[in-house]
């Protein structure tokens, strides 16, 4: 590791954070913090492009924050950030630059601007031709991809449903399991369907299996002109041509899969939204890039959230974080963040290959509110593990794009108020809790006749002091979504930089792939030689499918 890029645990700030935690932070109480600081909300509120973050309900005081910011400086975070934006090969295990930010920068504001914008212009022109359904004849667009070639577009299209074109339906197929693709095919007309085969290498097993099946269906149903109904987004254009595809939009090896929404992989988003809205998505992301690059660390939202992740993971020992978007359009955001965060930072060695003596990525999971409240919030409030929660709320929503009777508008507006009230109430309840004395003083609901009131009160009490962050979006539009996703990308970069890891490779995906290639023929031959006892037993149980 470069002498200017120090691993976090080797800094003086890390040692001082450990001492501060032992001395006082381990017993930090949010209720006491708010009682002692009438301006805590203002002190820990952060404005960033298109969103506001309330960090005040986190286990964070001024000394801890100062030490975390010192930690960022001692590991050389600003230098690493600037190196990434300039195109340095930060992905050191693959010798590649990390330049997803260049995909959303103005033409002359980042490396590779000319080629990026040439590809973008061509892709958006194609998207507009598809959207002209009177001439294209396309009514259904099916994106076939997996991982970074699926999760970003699959998250973005429903999030921006209000900006999509009526009469043009988007579908996403990722799973190797035919139960995802097969039922969809029964609903499609080959002459009005466009398939997008999204694979960086054009060799991904799941994607190519689904692509071959889609192609066979197209031909079996009398489909003609594969080149007009299949398009590829890939770095391997030759393989796409061999498949029978004439139209392919490329991208570059300095674009990681989970950072590729902004590239040609975003084609299904561009078709759904149109060129103007897709450029707004890029513009929102670029605004967050500039915030990350220029805002002081003390007011830099991605930096603060990344440092908070380190604080909780390495000093408080918390193992996971729950994401609860209070907007149904963001229902796929938790799944998107799972790949972005855990594939990036789920590493056990540093950039030099040295084993890490501390934990890295937390488990990231979640569901939309209020559904989540009726699923796992019981554990968040009363469970034995403390799990920080990230609430995402959208102030203004509209259903004007839908053909609904005007009489529904006040009812839907009231539903939105109730939704926001639920979001705020959950973060308040996690912090405030309810003591046994409070529970005992309340009129209790009907309980077992032989249960003493004090025992019931223990069941009905809440420990409180459970941390949360609330992200407030003015509205869910393309620019706001772009800023939100870019913020999460830079947050991942920040925590990865402190941990001294390469956040841009994913070797953990490869071993299972290799073993699958070895096992696949054995499912037919039954050959179990050289395998472990468990795998032998499972092969025998499966027989020959």
Curated annotation (Swiss-Prot):
Keywords, alphabetical: Cytoplasm, Gluconeogenesis, Glycolysis, Isomerase
UniProt-annotated catalytic positions: 343, 374, 513
Example of a GO MF term: monosaccharide binding
SUPFAM superfamilies given in the database record: SIS domain (SSF53697)
Pfam families the UniProt entry points to: PGI
Pathway the protein acts in: Carbohydrate biosynthesis; gluconeogenesis; Carbohydrate degradation; glycolysis; D-glyceraldehyde 3-phosphate and glycerone phosphate from D-glucose: step 2/4
Record EC number: 5.3.1.9
Keyword Chaperone among UniProt keywords: no
EC primary class: isomerase
Gene3D superfamilies according to UniProt: 1.10.1390.10, Glucose-6-phosphate isomerase like protein, domain 1
Cellular compartments annotated: Cytoplasm
CC per GO annotation: cytosol
The protein's role, per its UniProt record: Catalyzes the reversible isomerization of glucose-6-phosphate to fructose-6-phosphate.
Catalytically driven reaction(s): alpha-D-glucose 6-phosphate = beta-D-fructose 6-phosphate
Phylogenetic lineage: Bacteria, Pseudomonadati, Pseudomonadota, Betaproteobacteria, Burkholderiales
Protein name: Glucose-6-phosphate isomerase
UniProt gene name: pgi
PANTHER family linked to this entry: GLUCOSE-6-PHOSPHATE ISOMERASE
BP GO terms, sorted: gluconeogenesis; glucose 6-phosphate metabolic process; glycolytic process
Membership in a protein family: Belongs to the GPI family.
């Amino acid at each position: 590791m470069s002498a200017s890029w120090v691993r976090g645990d080797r800094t003086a700030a890390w040692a001082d954070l450990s001492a501060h935690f032992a001395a006082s932070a381990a017993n930090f109480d949010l209720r006491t913090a708010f009682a002692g600081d009438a301006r805590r909300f203002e002190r820990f509120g952060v404005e960033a492009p298109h969103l506001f973050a309330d960090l005040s309900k986190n286990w964070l005081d001024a000394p801890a924050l100062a030490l975390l910011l010192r930690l960022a400086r001692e590991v050389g975070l600003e230098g690493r950030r600037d190196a990434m934006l300039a195109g340095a090969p930060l992905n050191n295990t693959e010798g590649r630059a990390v330049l997803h930010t260049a995909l959303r920068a103005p033409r002359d504001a980042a490396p590779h601007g000319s080629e990026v914008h040439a590809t973008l212009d061509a892709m958006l022109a194609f998207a507009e031709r598809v959207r002209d359904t009177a001439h294209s004849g396309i009514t259904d667009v099916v994106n076939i991809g997996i991982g970074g070639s699926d999760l970003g577009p699959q998250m973005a299209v429903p999030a921006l449903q209000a900006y999509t074109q009526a009469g043009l339906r988007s579908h996403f197929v990722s799973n190797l399991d035919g139960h995802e693709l097969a039922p969809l095919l029964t609903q499609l007309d080959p002459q009005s369907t466009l398939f997008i085969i999204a694979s960086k290498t054009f060799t991904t097993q799941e994607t190519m299996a689904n692509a071959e099946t889609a192609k066979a269906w197209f031909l079996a149903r009398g489909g003609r002109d594969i080149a007009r109904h299949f398009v590829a987004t890939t770095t391997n254009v030759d393989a796409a041509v061999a498949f029978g595809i004439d139209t392919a939009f490329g991208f570059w090896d300095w674009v990681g899969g989970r950072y590729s929404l902004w590239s040609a992989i975003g084609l299904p988003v561009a078709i759904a939204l149109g060129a103007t809205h897709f450029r707004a998505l890029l513009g929102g992301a670029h605004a967050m890039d500039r915030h990350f690059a220029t805002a002081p660390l003390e007011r830099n939202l991605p930096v603060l959230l990344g440092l908070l992740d380190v604080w909780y993971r390495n000093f408080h020992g918390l193992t996971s974080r729950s994401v609860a978007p209070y907007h149904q359009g963001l229902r796929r955001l938790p799944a998107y963040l799972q790949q972005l965060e855990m594939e990036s930072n789920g590493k056990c060695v540093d950039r030099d290959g040295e084993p890490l003596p501390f934990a890295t990525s937390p488990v990231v999971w979640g569901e939309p509110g209020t559904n989540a409240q009726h699923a796992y919030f019981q554990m968040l409030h009363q469970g034995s593990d403390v799990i920080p929660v990230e609430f995402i709320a959208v102030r203004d929503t509209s259903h004007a794009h839908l053909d609904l009777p005007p009489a529904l508008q006040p009812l839907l507006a009231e539903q939105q108020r109730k939704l926001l009230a639920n979001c705020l109430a959950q973060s308040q309840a996690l912090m405030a809790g309810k003591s046994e004395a409070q529970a005992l003083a309340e009129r209790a609901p009907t309980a077992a006749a032989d249960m003493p009131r004090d025992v019931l009160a223990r069941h009905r009490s809440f420990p409180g002091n459970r941390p949360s962050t609330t992200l407030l979006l003015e509205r869910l539009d393309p620019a706001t979504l772009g800023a939100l996703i870019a913020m999460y990308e830079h947050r991942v970069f920040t925590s990865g930089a402190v941990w001294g890891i390469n956040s841009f490779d994913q070797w953990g995906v490869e071993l299972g792939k290799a073993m699958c290639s070895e096992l696949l023929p054995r499912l037919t031959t039954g050959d179990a030689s050289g395998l472990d006892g468990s795998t032998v037993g499972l092969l025998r149980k499966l027989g020959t499918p």
